[in-house]
Regions:
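Charge-lined substrate channels and their catalytic hotspots, especially those that engage the 3′ end
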Residues: 65
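Structural signature of tandem-repeat unit edges
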Residues: 47-59, 68-86, 95-121, 128-158, ...
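Ser/Thr/Gly/Pro-rich low-complexity, disordered linker/stalk segments of secreted
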Residues: 2-41
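Short, intrinsically disordered, low-complexity terminal segments
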Residues: 1-2, 6, 88, 292
Length: 388
């Protein structure tokens, strides 16, 4: 039955349900060739390592490792009637046998929650160096704790990405069937759900993780989604969004994503809808009716766009380009042509905020760039003239 410890008991899960102390078996077998692996074998829990943690509010189990040899791993919701609540960093690592990992869902949400350590401080990643992993199925009660419950989602893209480091074949993340809205209303932004293999918050408000190996070249963001996090996707070339969403999108597209060629605002009309696409550049318009003139921003400039020069489109009276700073990921652009009704962000003088090969900004007469900003750009090797 395993060695009794007052605060913590270690063990390994077997398909028979037996437990034992310490590590059972060895890591031999983690380097099996693909020819020797049966991908359609039934999911197995054999080889899971866990810790039982006793607290004042009851006991819970944390998965800390895996030493089995199954292509399809099953993590149960309960072990000996104790809820499996946490999974530790490095729980699944350095294993080229695993093809799928399924986390069993609980029938009653009141009996357990399930947490992933969504933090880059977690070392190593939860799913680390699993070169043949293709799919993960999470329980609907998956959460990342209070941080996701407070709607402060923007900074967590890196955290989600970090969870799956070294999983180049990961093509789908799924979730088990979700409870009724009545069960989840108080934690709307804490739970996760999946759609077409993509991981979202429970009501599709935020797109958290788009799998690296999902093979669609074009993907349409659901209308409900307002937070879009795109990682290093190998196949995705085109992202489609609604031109008139209820709120502005928060885009977080990683610099290392070298395949995404454009973000298309479907139904977009320049200066009429909230978003529109001109060529392969995405623009957004400020909705406020009190702003005069109204601000327009470059919302996304593809780092794959290989033009050496870019001229901002003419802008009608009553509008102006505000804070032009979306070009810093592009290594091709050398010259920018900026109309009079535009503000060039002075922060672009800093190396990390400007295109690395930018050498000239050509202003239209009447542009409000100050002499001190012109001097800063010049000092950093960017020539400013009025040859628009």
């Amino acid at each position: 039955q395993g060695e009794a410890v007052q605060d913590k008991a270690e063990g390994s899960v077997y398909s028979t349900g037996n437990t034992g102390s310490g590590t059972v078996g060895s890591n031999t077998g983690n380097s099996k060739t693909e020819e020797n692996i049966t991908d359609n074998s039934p999911p197995s829990s054999e080889g899971l390592k866990y810790e039982t943690i006793a607290t004042a509010n009851g006991s819970y189990i944390k998965i800390v490792g895996y030493e089995g040899h199954s292509a399809n791993v099953l993590v149960p919701a309960f072990i000996h009637d104790i809820p499996v609540t946490y999974i530790a960093g490095g729980a699944f690592k350095n294993n080229d046998v695993i093809r799928t990992i399924t986390f069993e869902g609980a029938d009653d949400l009141s009996k357990r929650q399930f947490y992933l350590p969504a933090s880059s401080n977690c070392a190593p990643a939860v799913f680390y160096n699993l070169p043949n992993l293709t799919k993960i199925t999470f329980p609907y009660e998956l959460s990342c704790g209070r941080y996701l419950a407070d709607y402060s989602l923007y900074s967590y893209n890196e955290s989600w990405r970090y969870l799956f480091e070294g999983t180049p074949k990961l093509a789908a993340i799924e979730t088990t069937s979700k409870p009724s809205k009545a069960d989840t209303a108080s934690r709307r932004y804490a739970y996760m759900t999946s759609k077409d293999g993509v991981l979202y918050s429970s009501y599709l408000d935020g797109l958290y993780f788009y799998p690296y190996a999902k093979k669609d070249k074009s993907f349409t963001v659901p209308y409900e989604t307002l937070y879009v996090f795109i990682n290093d996707c190998f196949y995705l070339e085109e992202l489609r969004i609604n031109a008139t969403p209820s709120h502005y999108f928060d885009f977080n597209i990683l610099p290392s994503n070298t395949h995404l060629k454009k973000v298309i605002a479907e139904g977009g009309k320049p200066f009429e809808t909230r978003y529109w696409t001109d060529g392969d550049v995405l623009f957004s318009r400020q909705e406020s009716t009190t702003a005069n003139p109204k601000a327009v921003s470059v919302a996304y400039y593809p780092q794959t766009k290989n033009d050496k020069a870019y001229r901002l489109p003419d802008i009608p009276e009553g509008y102006y380009y505000n804070i032009i700073n979306q070009f810093n990921l592009n290594t091709y652009i050398e010259e920018l042509y900026v109309p009079a009704r535009a503000k060039v962000w002075a922060g672009m003088t800093e190396k990390s905020y400007r295109p690395p090969n930018l050498r000239a900004i050509h202003l239209q007469e009447g542009n409000p760039m100050s002499q001190s900003d012109i001097d800063d750009f010049t000092r950093h090797g960017v020539n400013i003239d009025y040859n628009y």
